[in-house]
Amino acid sequence: TDVHSDMTDIWVRYNHIDNLGEHFNDSHESVWYPIIERIPEVLPIVFDLMAAVSGERLGGVLITKLKAGGKILPHIDRGWHAGYYDKFFVPIQNDKGAIFCWDDQVIEPDAGDIWQFNNDVNHWVENNSNRDRIAMIVCIKTFERSISDCRR
């Protein structure tokens, strides 16, 4: 069963669609998708976040909607993109009862918060509210991660 079956998403930025195929999720340079022209409000959020975290490379940008009462089942994200970038969770609409969980932590964020999170460990989401939960995931290679990678 698909762990994300209760969720719908809009990819705003990711690998160029011309690269669609077996290696689509391999190492790539992300590009903006045309949908960005319809939701330009995303841009200042993303670029302000890049500046705030000393971002040096912008990866995927994903907007997700989890229906009221919906769940994203426990899972670990894998692959190049999941391992390469730092992940930032930006709740856009997150009513009381919509929680983001890891084995050792549960958060119930407010709209407008920003949380850095690891998606390469077990995590899940429960929307126990009466409205859709809408969030943006921004993937950024930070200066701190680059320095850490160089020290290995």
Question: What are these regions, as identified by a protein language model?
Answer:
Residues 74-75, 98-100, 117-118, 122-130:
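Short beta-strand His + acidic residue motifs that chelate non-heme Fe in jelly-roll/DSBH
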Residues 73, 91-110:
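A short beta-strand-loop-beta hairpin characteristic of the jelly-roll/cupin
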Residues 86-91, 114-116, 130-148:
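A short hydrophobic beta-strand segment most commonly corresponding to one strand
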Residues 150-152:
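Acidic/negatively charged segments and metal-coordination signatures
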Residues 65, 81-98, 139:
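Short, conserved beta-strand element in jelly-roll/cupin
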Residues 108-119:
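Short secondary-structure subsegments characteristic of cysteine-rich extracellular domains
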Residues 63-82:
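Conserved short histidine dyad/triad with adjacent acidic residue
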Residues 1-53:
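Non-heme Fe(II)/2-oxoglutarate
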